[in-house]
Regions:
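A hydrophobic C-terminal alpha-helical subdomain
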Residues: 78-99
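Residue-level signal for the nucleotide or nucleotide-sugar donor/cofactor binding architecture
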Residues: 11-14, 44, 93, 104-107
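Conserved short-loop catalytic and cofactor-binding motifs
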Residues: 6-10, 37-41, 86, 100
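Hydrophobic "lid"/C-terminal helical patch
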Residues: 23-27, 53, 113-117
């Protein structure tokens, strides 16, 4: 099988469970305001995220998702074609205010992805 995924849109995945825990922590303080929050672990493209999803799935005992059975092909947004949702090329966020106000950074997105795949019993 073959899957094409855009490689020129950059951001950081965010696990909703981790974000919800952060919101609970925020509610319990008086540090009101606007914050940017995403999982740690660096910026990646949608293509890189797809590759990691399938890598972790294969490592969890699903060989149908390994590189021998599934090819993930990087393409540009232009090559991919029209999408129903307009997406920014760069959706990186500055999260420095979180730590300045004493909040713990969210775990790495790779760890979050692994926890998510286990949660859904993938």
């Amino acid at each position: 099988d073959r899957l094409t995924v855009v490689d020129d849109q950059i951001g950081t995945p965010t696990y909703t469970y981790d974000l919800a825990r952060l919101l609970v922590d925020m509610i319990e303080t008086e540090n009101y305001g606007y914050y940017h929050a995403t999982n740690e672990g660096g910026y990646i493209s949608w293509y890189e995220f797809a590759v990691e999803i399938f890598r972790q799935a294969a490592a969890m005992g699903h060989p149908e998702y390994d590189a021998e059975h599934l090819t993930v092909v990087p393409v540009t947004t232009e090559e991919y074609g029209v999408s129903k949702a307009a997406r920014p090329f760069n959706s990186r966020l500055d999260k420095s205010k979180l730590t300045e106000k004493g909040f713990q950074p969210l775990p790495d997105w790779q760890d979050a992805l692994e926890r998510y795949l286990k949660e859904i019993e993938f």
